[in-house]
Amino acid sequence: MISRHFTVLTALNLQTKIKICIRNFSIRGAMTKVNGNSNGNGISASTDLLDTPSAYTQKSNKTHTSIDLRSDTVTVPSVEMRRAMAEAIVGDDVYGEDTTTNRLEQRCAELFGKEAGLFVTSGTMGNLLAIMAHCQRGEEIIVGRYNHIHRWEQGNYAQFAGISATTLEVKPDGTMDLNDIEQAIRVKDCHMPASKLICIENTHNYTGGKALPIEWMRSVKQLAERRDLKVHMDGARIYNAAVASNCSVSKIASFADTVQMCFSKGLGAPVGSIVVGPKDFIDRARHSRKALGGGWRQSGILAAAAHIALDHADATIRADHERAKTLARMINDATPEEFRTKVFAAEKDITNMVLVHCQNGVTVQQLTDFFQKHDILAMTFDARRIRMVLNWNVSDENLETIVEVYKKFLKQL
């Protein structure tokens, strides 16, 4: 009896030591990656620190005069939006009687070249509903490990839908290797979950708002069709992708079976996202939306603002892109030669995001803290990068202010 207990305790101790060794190895590996070099134009493992505080939950000392670059979600509704919201014709959307919402869903379906649409509370809900409508419990999605669906949506597909994920590396342009995708598709075997869905993200947030290459998206869609899988696009910023790719949103959407787009990001509406796809898919998503608490009533008040956002979408997004390119260039022009290996803004393939890289003795915390002391809010994106997202509440005059504060930061180093 004593021998059996001793054997069990020895095994438990060995198991604990193995866990500690694995954890220490992981930490050492992460530290090694942190000391590696970044290519400056996208992501690398060196930026991926799991213990970096989440900038998505950090509160700021925002005032009414702040220049807020943390996200394009921080905008406030325009006067035109507020008027449309106040005057919206509404009904009970659960009964299908909110005409403003119905018009928005139909408008978006036509805009994206799909059969039907569903207005939902958020992009996170929209992506989850899409996954649930494509997959049964016990099935699997294929998704990039840096994609918003996997990294910043709490693994909700597992929490609420019992769906697993195979995650793949993401390249600096936001794509995944096509061979990796194909190899991740499961063979039909009773020991394995069935692969059902490939999830892509356009534009790709973590790589700095990169617009996915058209030919890559076409290849992913062809691969999915050949292997009997579907493609869902997290198109939270699909309008940014369309402007950057110089094409229509319907062309971008044609490379996916289903798409989710946020109204509350670059388009500037206060709340809501749209999911579009085949009618039977939308019917399933609408059914699941109720279970998630998303069956709203007079949603037309919010849909009215989304209509206004769509009316001005192209002009709004183009202005953001131009300001982002200008800001990145101004930051680099303002950086003296001796600091250019320490602080720089990535200028390649910019949409509405500017990523400022801090290294070689300059930390992201130093720069974000200095900005905040001067009423400028930027996001600590990860261990080496600050994200500044241009939005319609940021003016050309604001860019001058940002760069002047940046110059002061460099002088006190």
From Swiss-Prot:
Signal peptide: none
Family annotation (Pfam families): Beta_elim_lyase
This protein's record includes keyword Protein transport: no
SUPFAM superfamilies in the cross-refs: PLP-dependent transferases
Organism encoding this protein: Caenorhabditis elegans
UniProt KW Endoplasmic reticulum keyword: no
GO biological process, one term: glycine biosynthetic process
Molecular-function GO term, any one: L-allo-threonine aldolase activity
Protein name, as recorded: Uncharacterized protein R102.4
Keywords, in A-Z order: Lyase, Pyridoxal phosphate
Family, similarity comment: Belongs to the threonine aldolase family.
InterPro entries on file: ArAA_b-elim_lyase/Thr_aldolase, Low_specificity_L-TA-like, PyrdxlP-dep_Trfase, PyrdxlP-dep_Trfase_major, PyrdxlP-dep_Trfase_small
Gene Ontology CC entries for this record: cytosol
Positions bearing N6-(pyridoxal phosphate)lysine: K265
Cofactors named for this entry: pyridoxal 5'-phosphate
Organism domain of life: Eukaryota
